[in-house]
Amino acid sequence: MLVTDFDGTLYRGDDPIRHYARRAARELAPDRRRIVLDGVDQYLAMGAAASAVPEAIDGWEAVMLLARRLGVDPDALQAAFTDTRVHMLSEACSLEVPSGYAELLQQLRAGGVRVVLATNSPAEGLDPLLRRLDLLPLVDEVVAGTGKPAGLRRLLQRELGGSGTVGAAGLAPERVLVIGDHWRNDIEPGTDIGAFGAYIDRFGRADGPADATATTVEGLLEPIRKWAATAVPTTAPAAPTTPAPLLKALPSETS
């Protein structure tokens, strides 16, 4: 089983980040607005080396931290985020699906690997975005509002048969791969239980160990292929080719 992140992994692009920054800062005075926009541009170009907001995990957090620092309140930030998710549904928003990764997921599914998309993005608006980017044929299951990192731990527990959840797959940890660009959310929950961790460290943060690390998903394709060659039984059935159902949320620990 391969568990993939969404933002910055299955798709990428800085247009949503810049839209979020513009929307969040639009009520600020011009000089303060410029600090936010320039700081976000610097972070996207330099990552952890950016002096403006080196502590940010990704571009979304860079916007949030800079905007809060300059006086944008939480309600305005949430409105800016919601507006950005709507913007992402439009062809006016430039987004890229890494073709090599998409092709690899198709190959893995044909070879019997179950692909799960686990994202903290809310279910609302997610399905049309997945359809806009033609991503549903690449995955077997979509888990929206995962609540990573804790929610990813629960998802993995379900798949490893440790939670008693109906449908638990009973996989061995070494037959699970987690991939994403946020080490604490996407990688650590997997490597903690012995899964293969593939970490996209675009911004040079080096937040923690992984079995494979690269600045782009393209740098992880060969390690993923090598993992699949040893982790997937040669007799594994091919994954279904029908579009994945959209799950609104991962069941809680008490549900």
Segments (PLM) and residue ranges:
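Charged linear interaction tracts used for macromolecular binding and regulation
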Residues: 77-79, 94, 120
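Generic enzyme active-site microenvironment
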Residues: 3-5, 118, 179-180
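Asp-based, Mg2+/Mn2+-dependent phosphohydrolase catalytic module
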Residues: 102, 106-107, 121-255
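Short glycine/serine/threonine/alanine-rich loop segments
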Residues: 72, 113, 195
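Small/polar loops that bind or transfer phosphate-bearing groups
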Residues: 12, 117-118, 144
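Active-site neighborhood of HAD-like aspartate-dependent phosphohydrolases
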Residues: 1-41
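Short, acidic loop-to-helix structural element flanking the phosphoryl-transfer center
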Residues: 3, 57-61, 88-116
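A metal-dependent, Asp-based hydrolase signature
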Residues: 38-88
